[in-house]
Amino acid sequence: GYGYECDNNTIRNCKLGPNVAAEHVDIKEYTTGTTVENCTFDGTGMSGENYAKSFINIKGNDCVIRNNIGYRNGCTAIQRAIEQNNVADGWGQNAMVYGNKVYMDTATNALGKKMYFLNAWDCSATVWDNFMAYDGELFSVDNEDDQWDYYNCNLLTYGNK
């Protein structure tokens, strides 16, 4: 295993990809305070190893995901931009996700399901100022009336812009 005392890490100004085997960033359970900011994710050649389906997988608490850009680039392994999981009781909570832009190529994934910006069932997240493009221009995904179009999250809060 790995050491669980891996808190308050910052991943900043990185270009990750192409040819990444699994998620570009995988924030593990039992970690707190991870920040991922100002990074670029290139999905080209991602193999989807270990069931990877997103640019970022959040399993830790109190994470900040901000000002990143993700390009799916036709990679069928990427089925959503960000995944948030509670694989251990009390974990995968309190994420702040804002100022991100993702280019997903299509509105549906390889399984014919909706291409969500954030998939985070039973995980709390606060979001604002996020944008997505399917096959064209970026659009805001932060309209509360359309939450279920872009955020598959039953514990979602919209923050202030």
Predicted features along the sequence, with ranges:
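Right-handed parallel beta-helix
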Residues: G1-D26, T31-M46, K53-F55, G60-G74, ...
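Structural detector of coil-to-beta-strand junctions
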Residues: A22-D26, S47-G48, K53-F55, T76-N86, ...
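A short, acidic, flexible beta-alpha connecting loop/helix-capping segment that sits on the rim
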Residues: E144-D146
